[in-house]
Amino acid sequence: MKLLALCATGLSLMLSFTSCTNNKHLISDAAERNAVQQDFETRRSKLSHGDLFQVFEQPMSDEQREALTFLYAYMPLGDITDYSGEYYLENIDYSLKAREEMPWGKTIPEREFRHFVLPVRVNNENLDDSRKVFYEELKDRVKGLSLHDAVLEVNHWCHEKVIYTPSDARTSSPLASVKTAYGRCGEESTFTVAALRSVGIPARQVYTPRWAHTDDNHAWVEAWVDGQWYFLGACEPEPVLNLGWFNAPASRGMLMHTKVFGKYQGPEEVMVQTPLYTEINIIGNYAETAKATIKVVDANQQPVPDAASNSKYITTPNSIPLPTKQPMPTVKPS
């Protein structure tokens, strides 16, 4: 009996030690981790009524807790109140599962995984269980493929599920699009981003508010492959990436942008930074770009402080204001 008790104690100690050493950080940089934690605490202090954050009382790994903290720090208020913490925790578990089981999972950098795989929301769709459903259906289909070929294969799968049909209603959820088997470009791209993320592939929805040649807009998808972002037409499979019907008009577009979940610090130009998301300009992925500086002076050729400029481009029959970059706040020296 004493020997058995000793063995059991030793086993208990070994399991405890293993559990501690297996706890990995989702955010390895301590400064970034602390910044997310501070944003989360600020958010939680403003939503102190009720049990909106009760899920954090559950036992979980450091990786799960940091992922949950990241989501709650930056998700829209409605997503906190309308969906349970258990829902987000399950989505996190499937994201981590995909990273562990997909052959490319360990090659995805922390930043791209955090901002372009982990988030559940893509647009203004209702959230659903698509990550779990899509993962179970796609995991064997992309088995043995390279990351590049997996992106192409997922888009083929999306084409089998959804075709283009114009609509004006609120963006349908990924599972709703599968059920109806149709969607406009914003819904097809929401669906395709969700499908790519379900198997651990960083993906984002790209939007141009107006083409240069016509008074219309479009949305499509970019996927991260081996250090580079590639574009694809959602549910419009091609044999290679960076090929779509919109190649030519995109090369003349005045703005291609995407809204990134959280405070994103990537190489792209930041147009707008809010407490919850980062809007970035990615037109450089589609056309050669150059910076132009407009100097506003008075009659004496002196700079006019805080002058507003308004530039437009012409589309028949309209003139459309060009997008502007939000001025970054200046910090006065103390």
Describe the role of every protein-language-model region:
Residues 290-298:
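A short, amphipathic beta-strand motif
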Residues 329-334:
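Short Pro-Gly-centered beta-turn/loop motif in secreted/extracellular proteins
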Residues 1-7:
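Bacterial N-terminal signal peptides that target proteins for export
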Residues 17-19:
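C-terminal motif of bacterial Sec signal peptides marking the signal peptidase cleavage site
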Residues 21-30:
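Bacterial Sec signal peptide processing site at the extreme N-terminus
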Residues 299-325:
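Short, ordered, surface-exposed loop/turn motifs in non-cytosolic proteins
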Residues 137-141, 145, 150-156, 165-175, ...:
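Hydrophobic/aromatic-rich core segments of domains that either
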Residues 28, 37-180, 215-216:
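Secondary-structure boundary elements
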